[in-house]
A protein has these predicted regions:
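Anion-binding alpha/beta catalytic cores of soluble intermediary-metabolism enzymes, centered on
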Residues: 1-10, 28, 35, 40-168
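N-terminal basic/disordered segments at the start of proteins
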Residues: 5-21
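Short catalytic helix/loop segments, enriched in acidic residues and glycine
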Residues: 20-30
Length: 168
């Protein structure tokens, strides 16, 4: 299986390297046949190519069967125009690969309730899975804009977008 590795920015390279250690050990133990290729993405790609999701990375992602993605963005690129900020690469990746849902688990394990910011009796037994839609709504809504006196954005979902994420 071909895996495109996009370390990204900030702590992303460190996290993806740790994930690769785990995947390599799993591959060695189970013979999964994983092959990795690293591509610049986000701020690192802006530094190398002038854009957050350059063509070599796009091609590598399209040819891969899986993507291992680190974090994206950081203060270094905050002053860039919106169209070339690291986060725009993330939105382009989601759109190009039709990655429309994100699963965000939140679970408090027994014995760790006291470490939660919630009261222990409230935190006890929490086990929630949040399904987050990634390619519609506020991310890609039009019209959007900003002037000296105001800013605006549009959050719109089509019925098929809602039905699709509801099936996740």
């Amino acid at each position: 299986m071909k895996v495109a590795v996009l370390p990204g920015d900030g702590i992303g390279p460190e996290v993806t390297e740790a994930a690769l250690k785990v995947l390599r050990a799993l591959d060695e133990a189970e013979g999964l046949g994983l092959a990795y290729e690293v591509f610049p993405f986000g701020g690192a790609a802006i530094d190398a190519f002038g854009e957050p999701f350059p063509e070599p990375t796009r091609k590598g992602v399209e040819e891969a069967e899986a993507v291992l993605l680190g974090s994206v963005g950081g203060p270094k690129w905050d002053g860039l125009p919106r169209k070339i900020r690291p986060e725009t690469g993330l939105l382009s990746l989601r759109k190009s690969q039709d990655l429309f849902a994100n699963l965000r688990p939140a679970k408090v394990f027994p014995g760790l309730e006291r470490l939660s910011p919630l009261k222990e009796e409230i935190a006890r037994g929490v086990d929630v899975l949040i399904v987050r839609e990634l390619t519609g709504g506020i991310y890609f809504g039009e019209p959007r804009g900003m002037s000296e006196a105001e800013a605006w954005n549009t959050e719109r979902y089509s019925k098929p977008e809602v039905e699709r994420v509801a099936r996740v």
